[in-house]
Amino acid sequence: MKMNLMKMMMNNDNNNKLLNKVMMINNNNNNKLSNKVNTKQLNNNNQWSMMMYNYNKNNELNNIMNNNMMIQLLYKMMNMVNGNKMFISKPQFKININSVVIKFYYYNMNNNNNHNEINNMMMRLSKVLSYYYNKEVMIKPIKMSYVYMDSNIFTDYIMYLLTNNNNMNMDKIMNSYMNMFSNIMPLNINNQDKNVKYLSGWSIMLKGKLSDGRSKMTKMMYGSFNNNNKNYDLNNMPNNMYKGSVNPLNLNINKDGKYNIKVKLNYNK
């Protein structure tokens, strides 16, 4: 399927067919949104950021539908490059009268140097999308060197590790990042360059229902999210602080129930 999708994106005659297919898949959802809620509610419930410089309600609704199509295309296309596992942030849309700028961050788990290939693919996609937005479209992918520099990317990364590695669990993941935390934090915060951005804390919440129907929540805070740990001293952290009743190792709903992971990251400059 990935090869077929790539061939369609490389063939200009088939580009519109691909986008039409995505539009048809989301058509029912978009119709429900347009009929049941107003554009202000839509903008608050979307999974992306959108900055518009026109106030036509019909245009706003059309842009939201186009953005919904675009965000799904990005997730699919970023993992079409051979030998890559990509995690992307929530795209940011800046819609002007004559142009649309789409910016997003991505993290490559395989650390392959294929930034040029991704840029070329985004340029081809921009040309196709310009027909749907009826204006110039520019897509700006920005590579991130560290997975913990965006909360959405970090969340998807944790979920991927838990669901694809039988030897991985939350204890191992969090302990590995706790050990790295002293290296992430500057030795002397007051003497650091103000332009340097560093991770100062995280909050990770696992929330869901067990197989017996009981609700459970486990919350893990460290660094600036923990008022009792202002000095970021790793020696004061108990070894079992990340163990909870929700076990994400074996993804058997009947046995273990369902759960969600929510990550918040805090940075200092």
UniProtKB/Swiss-Prot annotation:
Briefly, what is this protein's role?
Answer: Essential for mitochondrial protein synthesis and required for the maturation of small ribosomal subunits.
* Principal localisation: mitochondrion
Keywords assigned:
Mitochondrion, Ribonucleoprotein, Ribosomal protein
**Gene Ontology MF annotations:** structural constituent of ribosome
Protein name from the UniProt record: Small ribosomal subunit protein uS3m
Pfam families per record: VAR1 (PF05316)
Q: What GO cellular-component annotations does this UniProt entry give?
A: mitochondrion; ribonucleoprotein complex; ribosome
The processes (GO biological process) annotated in the record are: translation
What organism is the protein native to?
Monosporozyma servazzii (Yeast)
Compartment(s) where it occurs, according to its Swiss-Prot or TrEMBL record: Mitochondrion
- The signal peptide here is none
InterPro entries, per database record: Ribosomal_uS3m_fun
Q: Where are the transmembrane segments?
A: none
Name the family. Belongs to the universal ribosomal protein uS3 family.
